Each structure stands twice: as structure tokens, then as C-alpha cells.
Amino acid sequence: MNTFLLDYRQIRTPKKGFSGIFRDYVSDGHERSQLLTECFHLDAEKEGDYYKQLSLLGSRTYSRATLVDLLKRQNQRYGCSELHLKEIEKLRSPRCMVVVTGQQPGLFLGPLYTMYKALSAIVFAERQKALFPEYDFVPVFWMEIEDHDYEESAHTALFSGGKVAHFRPEPYKRLPDQMIGGSSFGEEMRNTVAEFIDTLQDSPHKEAISGLLNAAYAPGSTFETGFAQTMMHLFRDQPLILLSSQDREFKKLSRNIFARELATCPTASYNVIAQSSKLEKLGYTTQSKPRAVNLFYINTDNQRQKIELHEEDTFQIHPDKQRYSRHQILELCEDHPERFSPNVVLRPIVQDTILPVFACIAGPGEISYLAQYRKNYEHFGITMPFIIPRGSFTLIEPKFSRIMDKLLRITGKPGFSRKQIYHAVFNDLQTLKKNAEGIAEHPDIERLFNETKTEMERLLESLEPVLAKIDPTLAPVLAASSVQTLKIIESLEQKTRKAGRKKNEELLEQIQKSETAFFPEGVPQERMINSFYFINKYGPSLIGTLKNLLSGHSTEEHIIVEL
């Protein structure tokens, strides 16, 4: 198994690429230093910051007993093992920290990066335990089941016949803006599971995958249970803990944060705007747009509704139109914190206040919007944890490795390496495709054949005076032979050109297939393709293989893996 590391700054995806914030965050130099100074609290490259964070978390008070109880209850419901219960128990100690990551539940686990996030949290926690053996570090996967973007969660994709096959079950008894975690599946889900399984190629692992998904995504189950049971099964041998924030006990722990937001809004939004202005002055584009109130109201139908600040002390729920004074909504929050849900601005604050978070494993987009939140962390009286880029892979199947071999033979210069071919593919695929149009056909074909015909005519003409002296009747025979010889050369030229065009077409077709494999529909493979495509073909041991690769490499570079 070959691996190659690519600098994120050298990757240009056909569609959505990586933000400038993320590219600078994972690079070296002045831009990174400036970004960290202005937008983050800790630097993972500074040894002193690790001791600072350990001391800081050790001095804070957390509701550890409550956390342990609710995590045990949740994870037992998801089918955890004794390994996971022992891991949860560690959190009772003030010398136990959390390495957190998370994602909204995706259909059948969702795209590959969900698996990569979980593995990155596990590996980083193990690495910290090796560095600080007197502490424990527990990897926690925060399931963002309060998200209400059904279209994003209820979709997944597989490679099929050189194309991308999409799967989207129809919503079952779902209301607009309803939280996805509690959305249940109807009988239609049986068909979606069957179509998904049928699309997977036959393999020794297909039957087990079918059994897992049919059980986890049975009619009547929910996105939360389906996702959690699937995750727990795949990571049954890994110390990964799952967390659902849609839990009454967890909401009680969140109550003070919700109350501070309601009591001080729109201060948090002004903080994000001020931090965003700093980023824009540094030349970056920001993506997180705060609201005056960074909370949603959850009604009795589990719909997430906007809370609008109409006047200084008047709040209104949309679209239901209930109105509350600031005092009334604070009382409501005190009595019923389960009716509130943080948006993207407030969610990290909730996470890093309730959990003793040593580090957060984040994707490129998350790192970009976390850069906007430093002032908000300070507003809520906490320090940002280490922000660690998640592991990022492109998995290369053998047939595409062979295409890379062919490209290396045809386009490579002396000393050209496989890594340089991948660099060319990931850095400027369109230019590579344009260049390939002329690769197979020799650029000097026309000149060489013209020179050959001219030389042949000259040689044949030089025979004429010699033949005339020997026998004048040979002159017409020579003329006919000259015509025939030129026709043979022209025929050879046409066949050469035809062979070149065919070779071009084959090469371009192979490059096109590689583009679909590496950038399906123009986006990175890890953002589109479901994990089970590769688990089905290469077995569940692939998870351990990728974990080992992450253990040996920095997550600040993209990893190409030839399977």
C-alpha cells in the first residue's frame, strides 16, 4: 500500500476548494502565525500550550458525574461494549480530558469524512496519552441531531458503473424545520436500503453490511438511532464515545449558556461581526453569519424555530409569532432548557463549556468558521481548545493506480515520481486533460512524414539517369514505383494518425474516469462517497488501516492511499 502526502495549497478541486483560512492554518510561515494570533487561543505546534491547556482544564469544574451517567445511558442504547463503558468512566476523574469531533447524522453513516473525523479523534487522543501518561484522553463524537437540514442528512452516494449513484429516501411524516435526529423512517426506507445494498458490488462483506443497515435503518427507527448504531458497530473495537445533545440532562447542563445568550444578545453576534472584520482585513472571506439571537426554539413538534429580537427586550418566535419579554424568555429557559437549541455560532461554546475539551478535530469548513468565534469564547469566559485538522484521504483503487502508472510513462520526465503525477492531477486537472489531447500523437509526425516523402522522391529521381542508360524502358516503371512508394508512405501516415487519435481517446477516457473517482461531481471523494463503498470492497479492516496511517502522518497534509 503506497501513500503520498499533498500540501493543501497544491490541491485545486474542480468545484469547491479549500478556503484561504484553512490553507493558511495548515501551512507554515507568517500567514499562519498571524491567523493564530488574531483568531485562536492555542497553537498545536507550541509545547507550552499543551501544558497551559492541561492546567486550565484541570482548574475548571465540570458536571462529570452527570456527564458519565448520561453518556452511559446513551451509549448503552446505541449498543456499546464494556470497552466504551470503561472509557466513559474515565471522565469522572479531573485528569481526564475530551478530544471531540462531530457531524450531523448522515444516511448510512454519510460521506467518508465522517469516518475520518472519528479516526482522527481516536488517534489524537492516543497520541496525547502517550505524551502525558498521567492523564486520560477520551475521544467523543458529538452527533449534531438537532440540525434541521434534512436534504443534507438524508442523502448519500456510491460509485456505480463509472458514475455516481445517489440515494435519497422520501421524508416520512416530516414537518418543515423538524430536527433530523428524531425524524423516523417509514416503509420506504426498506426500498432505499435495498437499492443501496444492490448497488454495492458482490463481496464477502456485503451480507454483513446488509444485515447491519437493515437492522439500524428499519422502519420506525430514527436518524439518531440508525446513525449511532452503525457508528457503534463499525467502531466497536475502538474507544469512541457517542454524544447526543438532544437529551434533557444535557440541556440542563446547557441552561446557563442559553441564559447568557438570551440575557446579553445581540452581544455574541457583534463579537462574531467584529472578529469577521479582522479576518476580512487580513484578506479572508468569512462564511458564518450570526443572528441577533444564536438560539432556536424547539416547539412541541420538534421544529427548530428562529428567535427574533424585535426590540431591546422583546423576543418573537417565528413563524409561530409567540412574543416574550426578556424576563419571560429567561424564565422559560430556566424552566425548560430542552426547548432551546444552539445555532452554529453557539454550539461550539456549549460543547467546550460542558465538556472538558482538550482538542477539537475539525474539517476545513469548521476551522474557517471557528476563526470567527474567538471573541465569543472570551465573552462566555472560556478558552478555545486546540483546533486540529481532521485526517483527509483520497482512496485510490488498483485500476486507477494503473492509470497513474500509464500517465507517468507517457507524460513523465526523467526522474518524475508518482507523487508528482498525483500533484499534477490534484493541482491542475484541467490543464492535464488539455495536455493529454496531444500526448499520444508525436508532435513531429507531420514534419517527419513530409521529410520522408521528400527524401524518397529525391532518391527515386536520382535513379532515373542511371536506369535510362541501362534501359530507357525502365523509366515508366520507375515513375509507377515512385507513385506507389509515396502512396505506401501516405497510408502509413494515416494509420499512424488514426492510432494516435485512438490512443488519445483511451487516455482521455481514463483520465475522465480518474476524475470521477477522485472528484465525483467535482468535489473531493471524501465529501461525496459513502464509507460502505470501500468497506464492502476492502473489508472493515480498512478502518484499522486508515487509523494506522493517521498515526504515522500529520493531518495537516492530504493523504493519497493506493489500496
UniProtKB/Swiss-Prot annotation:
Residues 444-464, 493-517 form a coiled coil. InterPro entries: Bacillithiol_biosynth_BshC, CC_BshC, Rossmann-like_BshC. Keywords: Coiled coil, Ligase. The gene is bshC. Its EC number is 6.-.-.-. This is Putative cysteine ligase BshC. It is an enzyme of class 6 (ligase). One of its GO terms (molecular function) is ligase activity. Belongs to the BshC family.
